[in-house]
Design a protein with these regions (language model features):
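Non-catalytic signal-transmission and effector/linker regions of two-component phosphorelay proteins
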Residues: 1-11, 17-24, 45, 71, ...
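Two-component/phosphorelay signaling modules centered on CheY-like receiver
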Residues: 17-35, 103
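Acidic, metal-coordinating helix/loop segments flanking the phosphotransfer/catalytic sites
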Residues: 36-54
Length: 133
């Protein structure tokens, strides 16, 4: 399997600590730089969205859910790809994946290899000047 440059930065947002750690291990095995956040609020307050190449987020979280996070991200970084991992895909009814909001959806449980492929595709679609790898 091809390793990725360590300069690709992936933010992972989920209120489930075990899922955060599982995704961290998966992504670090492919040499991604991983930033973990236990809430959407924590990501938004971190100020690191501008330096992030892709966001992976749960949808159902307290205070700010994944859909509101998507809106906040795209208000400041419209081309930043967002990948949802969720047990509740029905919450996305009416939104068009891979449309102007640049998101993909994986239902929990998901296959790690499929998530890695989605991340690879997402960072390859970044404008050339935004690619770090």
């Amino acid at each position: 399997m091809t390793k990725h440059p360590p300069s690709y930065i992936i933010a992972v947002v989920d209120d489930d600590p075990s899922l955060l750690q599982s995704i961290r291990i998966l992504l670090e095995s492919q040499d991604y730089v991983v930033r973990l956040f236990a809430s959407a609020t924590a990501l938004l307050k971190s100020g690191c969205i501008a330096d992030t190449d892709c966001v992976i987020s749960d949808i159902t979280m307290p205070v700010i859910n994944g859909l509101d996070l998507l809106k906040a991200i795209h208000a400041s970084s419209p081309g930043l790809p967002v990948i949802f991992v969720t047990g509740h895909p029905e919450m996305l009814d009416g939104l068009a994946p891979d449309g102007p909001q640049h998101f993909r959806v994986f239902t929990k449980p998901f296959k790690g290899q499929e998530l890695l492929e989605a991340i690879r595709d997402a960072v390859q679609q970044l404008p050339t000047q935004e690619r770090r790898g």
